[in-house]
Amino acid sequence: MATVEPETTPTPNPPTTEEEKTESNQEVANPEHYIKHPLQNRWALWFFKNDKSKTWQANLRLISKFDTVEDFWALYNHIQLSSNLMPGCDYSLFKDGIEPMWEDEKNKRGGRWLITLNKQQRRSDLDRFWLETLLCLIGESFDDYSDDVCGAVVNVRAKGDKIAIWTTECENREAVTHIGRVYKERLGLPPKIVIGYQSHADTATKSGSTTKNRFVV
């Protein structure tokens, strides 16, 4: 005679405690996976392509704006390296609200620390120097004088490339020289290499191919 096994009632799972719920949520959504790291300023990246048939301003194009570390790297990794640009092209990174031109209200009384590279340095140094320049800007690397920084420009030219950090007030000796010293150190330039700071006004009115330096480090 067949025997019938008695039905067994499944044991219910014990209720989840609040602590276990919290642990479970942390596993699913670790804040590090989705929280972006904000920068102190919002920045705008511009691109200039020298088309002789257009005006200077028509050749200048805003690529993108960003205000987090993650968005900076996403943009940087998406665009062409400076060393791959055609001669006559520029990248400019400026604080949002400042246009990369001398005439801008924040730039017109300012100037630039200028790094001049020879043609051989396009392959060896240009991209490294430009990235370090960008990191100096977005990382506010100039201590109390980071507010004096407006932006930076890389000019890709057949005769030799240039990188410059622009500041807002050329008469502010303390800020300008501090920025220059920190910048030179961050680029790893040896002491024997001298870099110069030129006011935009002097550059605009220069007679000849060179502009006098207001400061050197």
From Swiss-Prot:
PTM-bearing positions, type Phosphothreonine: 22
Q: Please indicate if the UniProt record lists tRNA-binding as a keyword.
A: no
Q: Where is this region: EIF4EBP1/2/3 binding?
A: 37-40, 73-77, 132-139
Give the free-text PTM comment from the record.
Answer: Phosphorylation increases the ability of the protein to bind to mRNA caps and to form the eIF4F complex. Phosphorylation also enhances its mRNA transport function. Phosphorylation at Ser-209 is not essential for protein synthesis.
Residue segments, region Disordered: 1-30
Q: Where, per UniProt, does this protein localize?
A: Cytoplasm, P-body; Cytoplasm; Cytoplasm, Stress granule; Nucleus
- Modified positions (Phosphoserine) are 209
Q: Which UniProt keywords apply?
A: Acetylation, Autism, Autism spectrum disorder, Chromosomal rearrangement, Cytoplasm, Host-virus interaction, Initiation factor, mRNA transport, Nucleus, Phosphoprotein, Protein biosynthesis, RNA-binding, Translation regulation, Transport
Q: Record's superkingdom?
A: Eukaryota
Q: Which residues carry this modification: N-acetylalanine?
A: 2
Q: Which GO terms describe its cellular component?
A: chromatoid body; cytoplasm; cytoplasmic ribonucleoprotein granule; cytoplasmic stress granule; cytosol; eukaryotic translation initiation factor 4F complex; extracellular exosome; glutamatergic synapse
Q: Which GO terms describe its biological process?
A: behavioral fear response; cellular response to dexamethasone stimulus; G1/S transition of mitotic cell cycle; mRNA export from nucleus; negative regulation of neuron differentiation; negative regulation of translation; neuron differentiation; positive regulation of mitotic cell cycle
What InterPro entries does this protein map onto?
Answer: TIF_eIF4e-like, TIF_eIF_4E, TIF_eIF_4E_CS
Q: What is its main location?
A: cytoplasm
Question: Which PANTHER family does the UniProt entry name for this protein?
Answer: EUKARYOTIC TRANSLATION INITIATION FACTOR 4E, EUKARYOTIC TRANSLATION INITIATION FACTOR 4E RELATED
Q: What's the subunit arrangement here?
A: eIF4F is a multi-subunit complex, the composition of which varies with external and internal environmental conditions. It is composed of at least EIF4A, EIF4E and EIF4G1/EIF4G3. EIF4E is also known to interact with other partners. Interacts with EIF4ENIF1/4E-T; promotes recruitment to P-bodies and import into the nucleus.
For this chain, the family text in UniProt reads: Belongs to the eukaryotic initiation factor 4E family.
Function (record text): Acts in the cytoplasm to initiate and regulate protein synthesis and is required in the nucleus for export of a subset of mRNAs from the nucleus to the cytoplasm which promotes processes such as RNA capping, processing and splicing. Component of the protein complex eIF4F, which is involved in the recognition of the mRNA cap, ATP-dependent unwinding of 5'-terminal secondary structure and recruitment of mRNA to the ribosome.
The remark listed among the other comments is: The antiviral drug ribavirin relocalizes nuclear EIF4E to the cytoplasm and reduces the elevated EIF4E levels found in acute myeloid leukemia patients, suggesting its potential use as a therapeutic agent. Ribavirin suppresses EIF4E-mediated oncogenic transformation by binding to EIF4E at the functional site used by the m7G mRNA cap and competing with the mRNA cap for binding to EIF4E which leads to relocalization of the majority of EIF4E to the cytoplasm and inhibition of nucleocytoplasmic mRNA transport.
Q: Which disease is it linked to?
A: Autism 19: A complex multifactorial, pervasive developmental disorder characterized by impairments in reciprocal social interaction and communication, restricted and stereotyped patterns of interests and activities, and the presence of developmental abnormalities by 3 years of age. Most individuals with autism also manifest moderate intellectual disability.
* Name of the featured protein: Eukaryotic translation initiation factor 4E
Q: Which gene encodes it?
A: EIF4E
